[in-house]
Amino acid sequence: MSAWSAKNNLCFGQVKVSEKSNEITAIPLLLDLLDIEDSTITMDAMGCQFAIADKIVESKANYVLALKGNQGEFHDDIKLFLETNLTNKFSKIAHTVSKTLNGEHGRIEQRNVWLTNDIQWLIERHPRWKSIKGVAIVDSTREVQGKVSHEQRLYITSHGDKSADFIARAIRSHWFVENK
C-alpha cells in the first residue's frame, strides 16, 4: 500500500500489506509514517473506517473517503438522504454543486458533485463518525458510441468549509492516481 501525492506526482510512503491482513490494518501504519498536516487524504471505500477518519483528523489533516455498502446502516442512511435530496435538486437544504462536462476520444461524460454540510442528524445517529462534516454524491452520465451509462458514488468528508468544486477536484485526483 502506498501514499501518493497527486499534487507532486510522487509516492511519499509505502508499507507492505501482510498476506494474513488487509489494507485496513496497513493504513494506520502508513499514516504514522507521514506528516499529513494540512493535507486532504483521499481513499477508496476500504479506507472508509471511523478509526482511520479520526486518525487523519487527529493528525491535523482532512479526508474525502469513498463510501460503499461495507459501512452498513451508515452507508444506507447517507445513500437514502443524498438520493432523496438529489431527486429534489437539493432544494430543501444548504449545498454546493460542481458540474463538469468532458468530451474526448469519442466519449462524453457529465459529472455533477453535490455536497452538503447539513448533516447534524447524521452525526447524532452515528456518533462514532465524530469527524464527519459533509457528505457528497457524484452523479455521472457517460456516453460512448451511443451507449449511455449512469453511475452514482457516495463520499464523506471532514472538510466543513470547502465547496463541491474542491471535493470534485479531490475525487478526480484520487481517480487519476487509481488509473495510473
PLM region spans:
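Conserved, well-structured functional cores that handle cations and Mg-NTP chemistry
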Residues: 1-43, 48-51
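Solvent-exposed alpha-helices and their adjacent loops that cap or buttress functional pockets
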Residues: 4, 33-35, 55-58, 145-148
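Alpha-helical scaffold segments in soluble metabolic enzymes
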Residues: 29, 33, 55, 77, ...
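Phosphate- and divalent-cation-binding pockets in alpha/beta enzyme and binding domains
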Residues: 51-52, 73
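Short, surface-exposed basic-aromatic patches at helix termini and helix-loop junctions that form
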Residues: 53-61, 83
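Short hydrophobic alpha-helical runs that function as membrane-insertion/retention elements
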Residues: 62-67
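An anionic, glycine-rich sequence signature occurring as long contiguous blocks
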Residues: 68-172
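Phosphate-centric recognition/catalysis
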Residues: 178
